[in-house]
């Protein structure tokens, strides 16, 4: 769409500049009608109208150059609006409806939510291991830092902020 607009405007500018450039170079000579000097003899000139207009001088042609691109752009704009207003099933793919923007956004949100949940689980596992190491160091078994399976908490996913900071909850 952008290329169509730019090409139409470029063509219009080129034709206008061509017309103004070469129309100024054309000299308007006033020669008498009838016999015109041509070398040593006279040439008989046909009766032509005094102000003959070429295709560059026609106002209707320039109006056409200005109106046609405008009409084309308006028709394309209207067809785009109609496409946006029509249901997606009627736009040429009756058997497959394309994903809407809301569905794409919800898929993105689901992916982000799942990633954050996985990150939270990994963080809780890490905090639980650090807490167990801290407990093992406090009990005096500093020489044996390897934790056995029996020292792992029963529910590693249930770690609260109070437990992370070492505060005991009052409840």
UniProtKB/Swiss-Prot annotation:
Membrane spanning segments where?
53-73
Carries keyword Nucleus? yes
**CC per GO annotation:** acrosomal vesicle; nuclear inner membrane; nucleus
> Cytoplasmic side: which ranges?
74-171
Any one of the GO BP annotations: spermatogenesis
Topology in the lipid bilayer is annotated as: Single-pass type I membrane protein
Alphabetic keyword roster? Cytoplasmic vesicle, Differentiation, Membrane, Nucleus, Signal, Spermatogenesis, Transmembrane, Transmembrane helix
Where, per UniProt, does this protein localize? Nucleus inner membrane; Cytoplasmic vesicle, Secretory vesicle, Acrosome
What family does the Swiss-Prot or TrEMBL record give for this protein?
Belongs to the FAM209 family.
Function according to Swiss-Prot or TrEMBL: May play a role in sperm acrosome biogenesis.
General remark: The primate lineage appears to have undergone gene duplication of FAM209, such that humans contain FAM209A and FAM209B.
Q: What is this protein called?
A: Protein FAM209B
Recorded source organism is Homo sapiens (Human)
């Amino acid at each position: 769409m952008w290329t169509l607009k730019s090409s139409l405007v470029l063509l219009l500018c080129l034709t206008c500049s061509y017309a103004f450039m070469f129309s100024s170079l054309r000299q308007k000579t006033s020669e008498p009608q009838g016999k015109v000097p041509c070398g040593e003899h006279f040439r008989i000139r046909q009766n032509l109208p005094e102000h003959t207009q070429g295709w560059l001088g026609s106002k209707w042609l320039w109006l056409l150059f200005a109106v046609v691109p405008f009409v084309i752009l308006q028709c394309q704009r209207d067809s785009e609006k109609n496409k946006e207003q029509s249901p997606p099933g009627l736009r040429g793919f009756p058997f497959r409806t394309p994903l809407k923007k809301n569905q794409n956004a919800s898929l993105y949100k689901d992916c982000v939510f799942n990633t954050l949940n996985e990150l939270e689980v990994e963080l809780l596992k890490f905090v639980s291991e650090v807490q167990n190491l801290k407990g093992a160091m406090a009990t005096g078994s500093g020489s044996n830092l390897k934790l056995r399976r029996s020292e792992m908490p029963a529910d590693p996913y249930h770690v609260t902020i109070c437990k992370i900071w070492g505060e005991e909850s009052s409840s």
